[in-house]
C-alpha cells in the first residue's frame, strides 16, 4: 500500500500500517498549551483525579496571548498555568523570562521534530508541519486527555497535494502562496484534510515562508499542513537543539491523494485577503486600483513575526516615515528574534520610521491588546484571520498581506505594491 507522509507518521506512532479514514489512537510526542487554553485543560486534568503528567518532557506551556498580563482577569488566568507548571516542575514552561509566540518559539527551541505527532490547544498548531511533522489543533479537554495518557485519537486525514511550480517574483512569500490556495479552494476546501505542500518552487521558500504556509492550512479548513524535510529544513534543524532524533518520512510515488492542485507561483502577485474571509483574495494590483486607505499596519503574529519578516520590513522602511494618519505596530514573534533584530539595527530603523515595537505577544491578532482597532478603522495585517471584529470593533476591517505589503502600505497610508516603493 502506497502511503502519504501523513499516513506514514501515524503508522509509526500506532504500530501498524494505517490509511486515510481509519480511526486510531496515537502516541503524542508534544502537547502544547498557552495562557488562554491551558487553564481549562488543567481543570479537566485535576477533575480526572490524575496526579502526574504522562510525559512531562512532552508537554509545554507557552504564555503568549496576554503576557505580560493586560488586566486582572488575564493575570489570574496566567497564574493558573504558572502554579501548575511550578507544581509539576515543568521543564518546558515559557513566560516573560523567555517569551515568544508558541508557534515560533517551539521550533526555535527544538521542541518539535520531524516525524512527530504534535497537538496544541490552538488552531494554528498546524504551523509545525513545516518541519515534516503531523501537527494539529485540538480542544482543551482533548489536551487534558493527552496530558494524562500521552495519547489521543484521530481519524487519519486524507491529503490534498499542493504543487507549487516556477520561481516566485520579488516580494512573493509563503504568505502569498497560502492566500492563493485559500482563494482557490475556500475556507472549507480542505476540511479535515492534510495539505501537503510540494513542488520545485519550494526550493525558493525559506523556513519562515514555510511556517507561514503551514500556519494558515487551518484557514482552508485543513486538519494540518505538512512539508517533507529537505536541505532547507535540515539547515534550519542543524541550528537548533532538537528534543529528539528526527524521523524522516516521504510520500510514496503513487500514494493516494484526495486532490492535486498545481499553482505556478511565477505568475503570482502579492495577494491581499479582503474582509471578511481569508479566502477573499485579490491581487495587489486590484488593491491599488481600489485605493484602500488604512489607519493601521501590523507586522507580527505566528504567521509573519519572524526574523525574515522584520528584515523585509526594515529594508522598505529604512530612511522613510510612516504616513501621518497611519500607525505601524511591529511585534517580533520571540525574544530571540527581537534580540537579533536589535543587533542588526532593525529596531532603530523601525523607531526612526515612527513604528511602535512591542514585546512578543499574540495580542493584536486576536483583538486582545497592543493594537486593537476602533470603530470603522482599517488595518493591513500580516496575521492569519480577518473575520468580523477579529482585531477590534465589529465595524473595523482587516486586510491580510505579507510583510512587504504591510510595511510599504504603512509609508503610503494606503495599500500599495511594495515593488513600487
Spans of model-derived segments:
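Fe-S-dependent hydro-lyases/dehydratases of central metabolism
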Residues: 1-421
